[in-house]
Amino acid sequence: MQITDQEALLRCIEHREIFHDEMLTLFRRIMSGEMSPVMMAAIITGLRVKKESIGEITAAAEVMREFATKVPLTDTTNLLDIVGTGGDGANTFNISTASMFVAAAAGARIAKHGGRSVSSSSGSADALDALGANINLKPELVAESIAQTGIGFMFAPNHHAAMKHAAAVRKELGVRTIFNILGPLTNPAGAPNILMGVFHPDLVGIQVRVLQRLGAQHAIVVWGRDNMDEVSLGAATMVGELIDGKIREYEIHPEDFGLPMIASRNLRVANAAESKTRILEVLANTAGPARDIVTLNAGTALYAAGVASSISAGLQLAREAIASGAARAKMEQFVRVTQELGSKA
């Protein structure tokens, strides 16, 4: 169904839904560079003001997937993305990046999709760069990295070239828009499982329902009540879980897993170098809140990937992967293999 840019803007102003086919049309115009910067800014701001619906987000994500440069993978068994929307303002070390190594060492296959920092002190790409990994592999080499190490990192700008049409508008607006929640929904390797952190409690229910419509297999969407886009140690965590096509919403608490509560300020870092130090401490099995929060998030990831039967079972696997040195070895292998693959390219 066709809709003009002006009609779409009017719908936003009147707080009315833009239907699925109409949203497909609009986002194809954005991603192909056909929409003017003025109309793009007006529409994405209007969507934010009226609050994007589940249907609108789903359609926009479908278009972004359509335009993405894919990673050629045929086997997606136990394949997982661990990703956050960012923007929680917590400035913690890269918990999901550390958790990725632990989960992979315990049997998950990871296709992590991320970028450099926008609002935080260190994005996943910044942390991996600091650890010495090559984050700029071509899609077929990302697939090879997954085959060899069980981990592939997809640097978002390499897979979403069409996003360049929105880049200047997003930068000048300087506020969150629908694009902030689309990135985690558009894994270029088609990972059917996901552990996703979000920056607002309303997004827990929204994103898990979008993932349901997009055909995800096992999705866990989390928001810590201390405003973290991770499973938190400082407060209860709201969870939206999609499994076997059904959605369940509940809360978990660190004490449910025998972990002490600790404020997120104890996990803060100023830059990627500090984040690297924290990650290496965790992988060296240094006791403390950093190890605890990585264990909790890696355990949840292992459950989401279908490797563990529950978060508690995943937690046990994560503990063993860290204590045995397997997680540290996995990180070292990933760094070495990505460097080797990059030098062949």
Curated annotation (Swiss-Prot):
Anthranilate 1 binds at residue 84. Anthranilate 2 binds at residue 170. It comes from the Bacteria. GO terms for biological process: L-tryptophan biosynthetic process. Pathway: Amino-acid biosynthesis; L-tryptophan biosynthesis; L-tryptophan from chorismate: step 2/5. One of its GO terms (cellular component) is cytosol. SUPFAM superfamilies: Nucleoside phosphorylase/phosphoribosyltransferase catalytic domain, Nucleoside phosphorylase/phosphoribosyltransferase N-terminal domain. Mg(2+) 2 binds at residues 229-230. It catalyses: N-(5-phospho-beta-D-ribosyl)anthranilate + diphosphate = 5-phospho-alpha-D-ribose 1-diphosphate + anthranilate. Its cofactor is Mg(2+). Keywords: Amino-acid biosynthesis, Aromatic amino acid biosynthesis, Glycosyltransferase, Magnesium, Metal-binding, Transferase, Tryptophan biosynthesis. Homodimer. Belongs to the anthranilate phosphoribosyltransferase family. HAMAP family: TrpD. Catalyzes the transfer of the phosphoribosyl group of 5-phosphorylribose-1-pyrophosphate (PRPP) to anthranilate to yield N-(5'-phosphoribosyl)-anthranilate (PRA). This is Anthranilate phosphoribosyltransferase. The lineage of its organism: Bacteria, Pseudomonadati, Pseudomonadota, Betaproteobacteria, Burkholderiales.
